[in-house]
């Protein structure tokens, strides 16, 4: 018999591999609000089963750490035991022979140091975490929209009720149905079975089938006046809820139209502007006054707003571009992505027919710029990114969409300098090849590779490496600023300037649409409280009874798009919504966590805030 033979996995190995895959799905959809001590103990136990057991630190050290953590959870540990965990974990970290032991020890160290208060409470026999967690998808949504509720309503064909329920927490259901990054899906418990429910797709189905003219009740006038600086999603969200509470709201917007980055940062092929206009019209119909083309700090003094209004909400967007800081970046032909997208939002679509375009960046703005350039007639579009595709911050579907539109990815290339012709116009971008190096903060860092620079011909170079906030006027007025961001409390108030509130990009940096909506909602509550109000935003729509049928494994319905060769020639909508059959199947995949064991909705869901 030959000494070599083909090795096949045993049944036990195949079973263990399946269990590990199930565990991976559970870790990906890990909910918020769970006990950090229990999570740490579970991860240490998992790592201990993965070690080879040949070195003492892993074989004995991890077992001892797990035993000590069990004592913490049992309430039998003392303060000295917490110190023992820290000391033992440090010893394992520096002496383990493999990465499994080292990383397990680092997890234990991180836990006992970062959550020391939780460990001490456990030692006293108490735990601040309970089994009464919020529904994972609701907790994952920054605006805390009642997602299981509106999915049940969509499945029942009650689309207007679904939109009414969404608007209790988010006045932009249509905009989010088309462009939201859907963080709610990251914690969907359906991932335990197969894959997350397509929540955004179901929301879009409701928006596409609602009847026009959403009715909204407005409270009795309070006599209080509020100024909102910035007509983007955050500012309009605050205006919407403050108007519903009965306050008189005036929105100041420096552009010719409302919408902020929804209008001037997201192209029409992703979010049709007719839908955005309809949603904004609904908000302003509540009595919100709008002043367009007004730059606060230039056309009107901030002090005048302080004098004329009872409260002021500052919610300006990040409309300034970050610089590459390389030679030649100020040459004609080098344009900021935000400026280009802003021009498109104003209806000024440049003609790039026959041009070679290079886009620098790896975020959603870079993908929007690249895909827009293709629609503007560019002969070729190359996306240059200094890291790998896997490290890009853009949504995977946006990266796929750019490639299908005919854009080319150039990974691991960092901009070095811009080449110009004798007239000073950009003709090429030179890039320095990179290689992935050490991991910092959970993300691999690139470093220059020992390779010559590459020349990338380009008549237009679009820079999309991030945005800045222009907060100079507000800092001069006296609002506390750090790194161009206005500093505020978690409730959006500014203690240094009573009556002033802030949120959105200008408070925490460029973020997503749903984060801006969260900021506006939080600010509306804080402003109402500051003005002496105690108004509620309610929705008393009755949710259908839960379906008790089994949820068998079933594939996720994905949103289709028009063919790349067809859609890359125009700015018409790319994504195709679900059919009724697809909607019913996808809504039926929802596990109903608001009813079955997990959610805090048992005994009555939250109908007001």
Predicted segments, located by residue:
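Feature captures the FAD/FMN-dependent oxidoreductase FAD-binding
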Residues: 220-221, 225-229, 277-326, 417-430, ...
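FAD-site-proximal beta/loop scaffold in flavoenzymes
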Residues: 330-354, 439-510, 514, 543, ...
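Redox cofactor-anchoring modules in respiratory/redox and cofactor-processing assemblies
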Residues: 1-129
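Local cysteine-cluster metal-coordination motifs and their immediate loop/turn environment
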Residues: 45-67, 90-107, 128-149, 171-192, ...
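Rossmann-like dinucleotide-binding cores of NAD(P)H-dependent redox enzymes
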Residues: 248-251, 255-286, 290, 370-417, ...
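A conserved FAD-binding loop/helix module that cradles the flavin
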Residues: 506-537
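Glycine-rich dinucleotide-binding loop and its adjacent helix/turn
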Residues: 205-219, 278-298, 321-376, 481-497
């Amino acid at each position: 018999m030959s000494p070599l033979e083909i090795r096949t996995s045993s049944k036990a190995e195949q079973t263990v591999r399946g269990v590990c895959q199930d565990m991976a799905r559970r870790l990906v959809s890990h909910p918020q609000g769970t006990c950090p001590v229990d999570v740490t103990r579970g991860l240490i136990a998992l790592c201990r089963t993965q070690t080879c057991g040949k070195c003492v630190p892993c074989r004995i050290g991890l077992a001892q750490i797990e035993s000590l953590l069990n004592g913490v959870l049992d309430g039998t540990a003392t303060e000295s035991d917490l110190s023992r965990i820290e000391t033992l974990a440090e010893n394992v970290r520096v002496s383990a022979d493999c990465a499994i032991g080292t990383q397990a020890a680092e997890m234990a160290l991180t836990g006992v140091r970062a959550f020391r208060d939780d460990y001490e409470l456990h030692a006293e026999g108490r735990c601040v975490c309970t089994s009464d967690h919020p529904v994972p998808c609701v907790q994952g949504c920054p605006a805390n929209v009642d997602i299981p509720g509106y999915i049940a309503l969509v499945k029942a064909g009650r689309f207007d009720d679904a939109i009414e329920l969404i608007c209790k927490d988010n006045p932009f259901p249509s905009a989010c149905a088309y462009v939201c990054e859907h963080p709610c899906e990251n914690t969907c418990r359906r991932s335990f079975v197969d894959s997350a429910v397509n929540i955004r797709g179901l929301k879009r189905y409701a928006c596409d089938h609602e009847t026009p003219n959403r009715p909204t009740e407005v409270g009795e006038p309070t006599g209080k006046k509020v100024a909102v600086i910035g007509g983007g999603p955050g500012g309009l969200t605050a205006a919407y809820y403050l108007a519903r509470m009965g306050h008189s709201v005036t929105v100041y917007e420096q552009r010719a139209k409302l919408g902020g980055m929804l209008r001037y940062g997201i192209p029409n092929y992703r979010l049709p502007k007719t839908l955005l206009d309809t949603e904004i019209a609904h908000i302003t119909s509540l009595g919100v006054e709008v002043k367009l083309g007004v730059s606060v700090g230039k056309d009107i003094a901030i002090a005048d707003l302080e004098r004329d209004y009872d409260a002021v909400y500052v919610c300006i967007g990040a409309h300034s571009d970050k610089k590459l800081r390389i030679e030649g970046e100020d040459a004609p032909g080098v344009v900021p992505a935000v400026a280009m997208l802003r021009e498109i939002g104003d209806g000024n679509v440049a003609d790039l027919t026959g041009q070679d375009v290079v886009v620098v960046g790896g975020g959603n703005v870079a993908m929007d710029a690249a895909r827009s350039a293709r629609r503007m007639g560019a002969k070729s579009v190359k996306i240059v990114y200094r890291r790998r595709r896997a490290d890009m911050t853009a949504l995977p579907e946006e990266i796929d969409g750019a490639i299908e539109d005919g854009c080319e990815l150039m990974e691991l290339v960092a901009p070095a300098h811009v080449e110009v012709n004798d007239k000073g116009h950009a003709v090429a971008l030179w890039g320095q090849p990179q290689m992935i190096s050490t991991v910092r903060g959970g993300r691999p860092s690139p470093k220059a590779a020992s390779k010559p620079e590459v020349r990338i011909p380009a008549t237009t170079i679009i820079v999309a490496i991030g945005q800045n906030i222009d907060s100079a006027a507000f800092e001069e007025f006296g609002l506390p600023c750090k790194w161009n961001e206005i500093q505020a409390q978690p409730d959006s108030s500014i203690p240094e300037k009573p009556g002033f509130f802030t949120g959105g990009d200008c408070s925490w940096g460029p973020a997503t649409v749903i984060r801006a909506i969260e900021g506006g909602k939080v600010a509306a509550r804080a402003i109402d409280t500051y003005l002496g109000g105690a108004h509620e935003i309610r929705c008393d729509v009755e949710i259908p009874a839960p379906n008790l049928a089994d949820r068998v494994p079933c594939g996720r319905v994905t949103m289709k798009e028009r063919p790349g060769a067809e859609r890359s020639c125009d700015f018409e909508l790319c994504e195709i919504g679900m059919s009724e059959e697809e909607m019913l199947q996808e809504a039926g995949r929802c596990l109903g966590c608001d009813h079955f064991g997990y959610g805090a909705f048992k005994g009555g869901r939250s109908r007001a805030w």
